[in-house]
Design a protein with these regions (language model features):
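A charged, aromatic-enriched C-terminal amphipathic alpha-helix characteristic of glycosyltransferases
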Residues: 374-375, 379, 392-422
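Carbohydrate-associated surface elements
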Residues: 204, 222-223
Length: 426
């Protein structure tokens, strides 16, 4: 019998949510619960979903002035009540994102902009559902403190920690970075000491975390749901590169390089286009990317069922990580949630990232994508020209990617292995 699992997440949405649901694909819905402060579109996937709200989340000024927090509720069906950031496209929010936010990050006030506490309402709900395991990826200092508080109240519930990235090192610059890292390190060490299960998403992370913290970590790749696509795929007459996902400090410079690459090719007479599918607000796009030329087209995010058709129809897919010191620290152990899905399409993938991180090492060793390890649009231009030429080497690369998706990233294989691990006797 499957144990009851409560997933506690900062934001259960987009690729992170899909990856987690794919990991729990073998789990019966009546044994799966979730508590999250953002995102309820996947609420129907759970027996019950607790939307963390103003009972558990307290923002400090000026964040309390800029962020509306809904009431804490048990969500049913897929009701879309969330912390309302994206809807507030006001002057004060624009000033905050473009002027105040960088200062707060620099002074290390961003990570602690809110605190979380275990409310009586949430404690009563946890008592009611009586989970055997709490599964969390932590992700920041407030969530780390929150997980520890929940454990102190419910010490009998086993903790499963899944480390997807090295969140102890933020992607933005901090004046006193060592102080921030030490604080986060102490919290993560405490969580790892009480955890019954310790997981990572890359072998590099499992190996180096064992050396760093002294615990054994089990690696589970980010699984992808493979589907037989019998429909004919129609490529657009205009060669295009597609990126689907978040835009932030970890990848904005790489995306800007691709934007410049496409615009340079356009100016040289090549008819090419860069299609970006993201849920970023206009303010966020301006903040992270600046002014964008017409050769780059932004699209609203599409349902997950449709994204595979978009990826299949592309001439090339783009997997970006900014080649900077701070992005390298944050992503050194990460594996993109999109990688398996990209590879499964058989469409050539252009990857950009620092040479020392897990994704770069994986892609180069498996020879499943074109790896660009230097910043600058000229390097992406060379990669894109190789894709357009589509020689036998590119075809072989794509075939290796498909095989990896069917074996290493296959949801049926990974999720069964994951279920066996969580259900075994400790």
């Amino acid at each position: 019998m499957n144990r009851k699992v409560l997933i506690i997440s900062r934001g259960f949405r987009a690729g992170d949510a899909i990856t987690t649901l794919n990991l729990f694909a073998k789990w019966p819905k009546d044994s799966l619960f979730c508590a999250s402060m953002l995102g309820t579109e996947f609420a129907s996937e759970f027996s019950a979903f607790y939307l963390l709200g103003n009972d558990e989340i307290k923002f400090s000024f000026p964040f309390s002035f800029l962020t509306h927090i809904d009431e804490s509720v048990i969500v049913k069906g897929g009701h879309n009540a969330t912390i309302d950031n994206a809807k507030r496209k006001s002057l004060k929010r624009s000033i905050y994102e473009n002027m105040l936010l960088p200062v707060l990050q620099r002074l290390d006030l961003y990570e602690t902009r809110y605190k979380m506490r275990l409310s009586d309402k949430l404690a009563a709900w946890i008592n009611e559902i009586s989970p055997d395991i709490i599964y969390t990826s932590v992700g920041d200092i407030p969530m780390a403190n929150f997980i520890l508080e929940v454990h102190r109240r419910f010490p009998e519930i086993k903790i499963a920690v899944h480390c997807f990235d090295d969140w102890l090192s933020p992607t933005y610059k901090i004046i006193n970075e060592s102080k921030h890292n030490n604080k986060a390190e102490i919290l993560l060490n405490e969580i790892l000491s009480i955890a019954a299960y310790r997981f990572t998403s890359s072998d590099k992370m499992a190996s180096e975390y064992k050396e760093r913290y002294g615990y054994t970590f089990r690696c589970f790749p980010n699984p992808v749901r493979l589907s037989a696509n019998d429909n004919a795929v129609f490529k657009s007459t205009v060669p295009n590169v597609v990126f689907a996902g978040k835009i932030g400090w970890h990848n904005n410079l790489a995306i800007k390089d691709m934007i410049s690459c496409i615009e340079n090719l356009k100016n040289q007479g090549s008819d090419v286009r860069f299609d970006i599918y993201s849920d970023c607000t206009v303010e966020q796009i301006e903040y992270f990317l600046g002014e964008v030329p017409m050769s780059t087209v932004f699209h609203k995010p599409v349902p997950n069922k449709q994204i595979l058709n978009i990826l299949n129809s592309a001439h090339a897919l783009f997997l970006p990580i900014s080649i900077t010191e701070h992005a390298e620290k944050f992503t050194r152990y990460s594996m993109s949630t999109k990688m398996g899905e990209y590879l499964s399409t058989g469409v050539p993938t252009i990857y950009c990232g620092p040479s020392t991180i897990a994704m770069t090492e994986f892609i180069k060793s498996r020879k499943c994508a074109i790896a660009v390890e230097n910043p600058g649009p000229q390097y992406l231009e060379s990669a894109l020209r190789a894709v357009i030429e589509n020689n036998s080497e590119i075809s072989a690369m794509c075939s290796r990617g498909i095989e990896l998706a069917r074996s290493y990233f296959n949801m049926e294989i990974v999720s069964q292995d994951f279920a066996n691990e969580l259900n075994k006797e400790l």
